[in-house]
UniProtKB/Swiss-Prot annotation:
Gene name of this polypeptide: apt
Pfam families recorded: Pribosyltran
Presence of the UniProt keyword Nucleus in the record: no
Cellular localization per UniProt: Cytoplasm
Assembly behavior: Homodimer.
EC number(s) given by UniProt: 2.4.2.7
Record-linked Gene3D superfamilies: 3.40.50.2020
GO molecular function list: adenine binding; adenine phosphoribosyltransferase activity; AMP binding
Protein name: Adenine phosphoribosyltransferase
Main location: cytoplasm
EC top class, as a word: transferase
UniProt xrefs under InterPro entries: Ade_phspho_trans, PRibTrfase_dom, PRTase-like, UPRTase/APRTase
Length: 185
């Protein structure tokens, strides 16, 4: 039986992510995580690597951000044996919610979480597909903390390391972990 190292898994994941030039606008090099989802070996490796990192760390909930964070957060939550909580755009969750607005490059956006999804004392791991500037994750962390949860860690498939997201979250006391790093464009 062949043993695959974490470095080999990370290389498999990185190689499965397609780079699309000039999408969604000229000058942007888009990192397409959906190509990773099309490769069952790479997708499974990403879930395994995240679950192995956070197994036995006291995580009580996994929060995933809309929408690709759901694709990685829910399977990791199952692997850890804990609940999964979605953070969504306004009007998408049926029970009472709390919301947090955040600034984008051109405008603002809002995220919501069910008001009863996180309990005081929950140790929450936040998972998303990609970390760029960190605005979405900052709003997500604020929502969780408003509900009494603790967020010490956030995990990503991709970190666009030169766009400042990791520094932004570090300043909030959140340790970032990513499977692969790419420059942002």
């Amino acid at each position: 039986m062949t043993t695959v190292t974490a470095q080999q898994q990370a290389e498999l994941i990185k190689n499965s992510i397609k780079s699309i030039p000039d999408y969604p606008k000229p000058g942007i090099l888009f990192r397409d995580v959906t190509s990773l989802l099309e490769d069952p070996v790479a997708y499974a490796a990403s879930i395994d690597m995240l679950a192995n990192r956070y197994r036995n760390t006291g995580v009580t909930k996994v929060v995933g951000t809309e929408a690709r964070g759901f694709l990685f957060g829910a399977p990791v939550a199952l692997a850890l044996g804990v609940g999964f909580v979605p953070v969504r755009k306004p009007g998408k969750l049926p029970r009472p919610t709390i919301s947090e607005s955040y600034e984008l490059e051109y405008g603002s956006d809002t995220l919501e979480i069910h008001a009863d999804a996180i309990s005081a004392g929950d140790n929450v791991l936040v998972i998303d597909d990609l970390l760029a500037t960190g605005g979405t994750l900052e709003a997500t962390v604020k929502l969780i903390r408003r509900l009494g949860g603790t967020v010490n860690d956030a995990a990503f498939i991709i970190n666009l390391f030169d766009l400042g997201g990791e520094q932004r979250l570090t300043e909030m006391g959140v340790t970032c972990y990513s499977l692969v790093d790419f420059p942002g464009h």
